[in-house]
Amino acid sequence: MKSQSELAIVLTWLAVLGTAQDDADYCAELSTQSLAKILGQAFNPRYMSIDPPGEPEEKSYHLGYKRSSYELPFYADSDAISVSHFPAWETNHFALVEKKKEAPRSKSLRTRSAFMDRVGHPRIDGFKQRPWECSSKINWIDLGLNYFPRYIRSIECIARKCWYDHFNCKPKSFTIKVLRRKTGSCIRINDKLILITAEKFENDYTQLWIWEEIAVNFCCECVMLY
């Protein structure tokens, strides 16, 4: 009786694994090169990275991306907005305009973040913190396997107060668009996808990737909230 139960469990697992393999064969995975072509002008080398932080950047160079010698730090929060449920290659993301929540009115002073090196450590170049400046540090955020690019840089305000404790340090933000894979969703490959990626697909279906908008903060500024 016990052996029959064990056999039933084994057969069930084999069936599940077989189904997963069939799904993988049925739904083709887009290559990094194809995703980079779909992302197109939305890729900003100052704020995004395809490769893990600290690794050589040859892969990015092969994809046609080259990092700027002067990279602005920024921060990405956890809020993300799906700007479209259609395939990313079918949507002109530059034409999509989202209404942003109005931020509190603020009066800001001229600010500058502390200089940082590539790995997020402050540079010791005789830098002296000024009263109207907010010190900050850079972190890397891993968005996970379902995002492209996967890695984005973030800045965290270290100081809470500025201008002799009369003003507050506040991150200044804007938005970037990245690709997000909708897990469990496949879509038929069409001529437009083939034209953009120039990829030869062996399957008729591929994974569905959509545009997602993420708010990022690129600096810390000294402000007085009303």
Curated annotation (Swiss-Prot):
The keyword Signal applies. InterPro entries: Cystine-knot_cytokine, Insect_Hormone_Regulators. GO terms for biological process: terminal region determination; torso signaling pathway. Residues 1-19 form the signal peptide. It is found in: Secreted. Gene3D superfamilies: Cystine-knot cytokines (2.10.90.10). It holds the Pfam family Noggin. The keyword Signal applies. Keywords: Developmental protein, Secreted, Signal. One of its GO terms (cellular component) is extracellular space. GO terms for molecular function: receptor ligand activity; signaling receptor binding; torso binding; transmembrane receptor protein tyrosine kinase activator activity. Coiled coil: none annotated. Required for activity of the tor receptor, could be a ligand of tor. Involved in specifying terminal body pattern. Belongs to the noggin family. This is Protein trunk. The lineage of its organism: Eukaryota, Metazoa, Ecdysozoa, Arthropoda, Hexapoda. The gene is trk.
